[in-house]
Amino acid sequence: MFSDSGYRVFQTPIVSRNGQTISLDARVETWTGVRALAIVPFEKNFDIGLLEPGTYTLNFKSWDTTVKQIQFAIVATPPAAQPIDGACFFVTQHYRDFLSREADGAGFAFWTNNLANCGMDASCLEVGRINVSAAFLLSIEFKETGYYLYRMYRGTLGRRPTYAEFVPETAELGKNVVVASNDPWRIRLSSNKDIYTSQFFNRPEFQARYSGLTNAQYVDKLFETEGVTPTQAERDEIVDSLDHCAFTIGCPTRVSVLRRIIEHPAFERRVFNEAFVTLQYFGYLRRDPDAAGFQFWLNKLNRFNGNFVDAEMVKAFITSEEYRRRFP
């Protein structure tokens, strides 16, 4: 309060309070001359008690005369929001959970701006968060990695992938892939899928089911496992391509045929709903779906003909206690 070294406090300050007014009487006097050089500045804390929310006046006094007055406010602090409630954290976490990577600058700005445009409108934010979240689930990048992996397991081994299998393998499928108009991402993605498909083809679990089969048996068994019936012409064309083009550069192989059949549009449509449910558990809850929960959401999604908005699926997952507990 007194910046000049020619003052000293010679009496312990007295603190008093009257309602919203707090006074500190410090009893200051002039102090000059050689002895003033011995004065050492110090700080002292004063207990003014617990203050309720409101506006207060703090008076600094000397000899009962107010020399300075400060007004301040105590504001009630709401419970701290969880990190996932913030737009930046929400978007960043979706990149990690669904695309297995950090956000790229353009994508991050686009999605956070979508939420920022809502301002403080709670209903707008609720809908916006659902739409942003669903966009990741349905993004080209996730469809070409997460859904492709799901179909690989489901269409060849007749089972869903586990969460432990899904996480590292999806990361490999999406390695160095960022979907952007000015980036040759399709080339990298196709290369990643070729590598992954070849590795999957050589796994013991796959070979136990498909090794030793003729080309025709191999193709028929893949379609049978998928639950898809191709046209006779389509089936025969695939078999003939294997029979008459083996070991020739540019000709189909069992690996390339595997990828072709896994990407069959009829199979994609057939398993989309079950994949959507499974990948929500993997992405949001970071675990395998429990049987009851999986069947409940699959039945509901089927009842709404695949309309996840009307089924309120994304909303249910991102507002669930289990999801929010991930971000204390």
Regions found by a protein language model. Name each.
Residues M1-P78:
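Exposed, flexible binding/inhibitory loops of compact, secreted disulfide-stabilized domains
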Residues P78-P328:
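Composition-driven recognition of low-complexity segments enriched
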